[in-house]
Curated annotation (Swiss-Prot):
Gene3D superfamilies linked to this entry: 3.30.230.90
InterPro entries reported for this sequence: Proteasome_assmbl_chp_3, Psm_Assembly_Chaperone
Keywords, comma-separated and alphabetical: Chaperone
Protein function: Chaperone protein which promotes assembly of the 20S proteasome. May cooperate with psmg1-psmg2 heterodimers to orchestrate the correct assembly of proteasomes.
Name the record gives this protein: Proteasome assembly chaperone 3
Source superkingdom: Eukaryota
Family statement drawn from the similarity comment of this UniProt entry: Belongs to the PSMG3 family.
An individual GO BP term: proteasome assembly
Pfam families hit by this protein: PAC3 (PF10178)
Length: 145
């Protein structure tokens, strides 16, 4: 049975309609997200970035796990015009300074254009300086905030 509004005899209608619906949802959805998989220094690296109304959620994983969770936020400085940053390890390894450095670099970049806080989940196996630079570069090239 054919609808008066929809020409169901057109096989390209469903595909075209699905693409339009997907584009509409992506444009109008309040949460903006990107998911990336990239080989960084021969290590498969998965990165997911989501921007919510009040926070940015980023996951970085080289072993398909969520090991360390860090919350970072920016606030106005008390005595100086410089902002201050609060970095808290909520779960996992709080002894690894590199994870706090990731969080600090990310929240500083987020803070340039937004007052959103950061929730970071990080689990990396390659802790080299080059990997650090490539991961941050990939995130900054694919910002959703």
């Amino acid at each position: 049975m054919n609808s008066l509004l929809i020409d169901s005899s057109n096989p390209s209608y469903d595909a075209m309609n699905n693409d339009n619906l997907k584009n509409s949802i992506e444009k109008n959805h309040p949460v903006k997200s990107k998911v990336l998989s990239k080989k960084i220094n021969n290590v498969d690296t998965d990165i997911a970035i989501s921007s919510f109304a009040d926070a940015i959620f980023i996951t970085i994983s080289q072993n398909q796990k969520f090991n360390t969770w860090i919350r970072a936020s920016k606030s106005d400085g008390i005595l100086l015009d410089e902002p201050s940053y609060q970095i808290d390890t909520l779960l996992g390894n709080n002894q690894d300074v590199l994870f706090s450095i990731y969080a600090r670099q990310l929240i500083e970049n987020i803070g340039e254009t937004s007052n959103k806080s950061l929730m970071l989940s990080i689990s990396i196996t390659d802790k080299s300086k080059d990997t650090f630079k490539q991961i941050l570069s990939t995130i900054f090239e694919n910002k959703v905030w």
